[in-house]
Amino acid sequence: MIETDKLATEQRIIAATPASSHEEVFERALRPRQLDDYVGQEKVRGQLEIFIEAAKRRSEPLDHVLLFGPPGLGKTTLAHIIAREMGVNLRQTSGPVLERAGDLAALLTNLEANDVLFIDEIHRLSPVVEEILYPALEDYQIDIMIGEGPAARSVKLDLQPFTLVGATTRAGMLTNPLRDRFGIVARLEFYDADQLSRIVRRSASLLNAQIDPNGALEIAKRSRGTPRIANRLLRRVRDFAEVKADGQITAAVADAALAMLDVDPVGFDLMDRKLLEAILYKFDGGPVGIDNLAAAIGEERDTIEDVLEPYLIQQGFLQRTPRGRVATLLTYRHFGLSVPDARRPERDEWDTPDGK
């Protein structure tokens, strides 16, 4: 039972991580190529415009950049845009791939002047690789060992000036020495429905899909604030529209397609509803401990904490308390339930005694 649910969770259509290598290829085709085409993240985009222009005027590499935030918000896209705006090459890798110091040294020594090195999941770098990275970031030099045993000696190699762009969904897992070496740190936030609607319309035009503004907005509202999910839903709605609606994506067509996919009006799927319904119906709205909740829905604790809960908490449908998980007023309303009187004081704990 648990294995089946794990498989279902990994294949969720509203998952923020790429579903397959095929989807990654599809994403690359839809990526904006310039900052002017990048939708949303206005603060980050404005900062990068200034920093990139200043670096180009001085003919210097851009300061090292750390991009962090939930998956699917455009960190990889921004890394590609940074390289393109700087007019340099981009080399891409990920933290888990760099297992040995030699792996990183090979990448660094092949960089040309002012190139961008993009390391995804940078929080997963091994300590050995991190140690090599520190002098490379500060002094554009690396120390490598030549030979073995008593004959081994350290050789210092000079590197071309370069920019490291690191991306992570877990900035708290970065070591302080590594974090301190980034001159530019930017957090990517969830998108609102209007921004996602613009992304959906742009992607639809690239896919030659016919979509009206209301159809784009309907997809956007169910995309959980994440462009990757919006583009995935657009592909599935396009399939539905071509078979059932002469290819035209309207609000009604999008609603019918997403209902078929079990994605409700706020972007919840079966797994989200299963978790919330368990709290409401099996545990009277909570509080319930994470282990009891995991047993009740046949999921692993890590899956609940890392995959299911973050969006529910961010949207205000779930609370973590010292006593366990608790359903909020929004959850009761979403399922059309009246709120038990015993629950009201917990939800209104900041109100004054007279209710004002």
Curated annotation (Swiss-Prot):
GO cellular component, one term: Holliday junction resolvase complex
This protein's name: Holliday junction branch migration complex subunit RuvB
SUBUNIT field: Homohexamer. Forms an RuvA(8)-RuvB(12)-Holliday junction (HJ) complex. HJ DNA is sandwiched between 2 RuvA tetramers; dsDNA enters through RuvA and exits via RuvB. An RuvB hexamer assembles on each DNA strand where it exits the tetramer. Each RuvB hexamer is contacted by two RuvA subunits (via domain III) on 2 adjacent RuvB subunits; this complex drives branch migration. In the full resolvosome a probable DNA-RuvA(4)-RuvB(12)-RuvC(2) complex forms which resolves the HJ.
GO terms, molecular function: ATP binding; ATP hydrolysis activity; four-way junction DNA binding; four-way junction helicase activity
Entry's localization field: Cytoplasm
Residues where DNA binds: 301, 320, 325
Notes on the domains: Has 3 domains, the large (RuvB-L) and small ATPase (RuvB-S) domains and the C-terminal head (RuvB-H) domain. The head domain binds DNA, while the ATPase domains jointly bind ATP, ADP or are empty depending on the state of the subunit in the translocation cycle. During a single DNA translocation step the structure of each domain remains the same, but their relative positions change.
Keyword tags: ATP-binding, Cytoplasm, DNA damage, DNA recombination, DNA repair, DNA-binding, Hydrolase, Nucleotide-binding
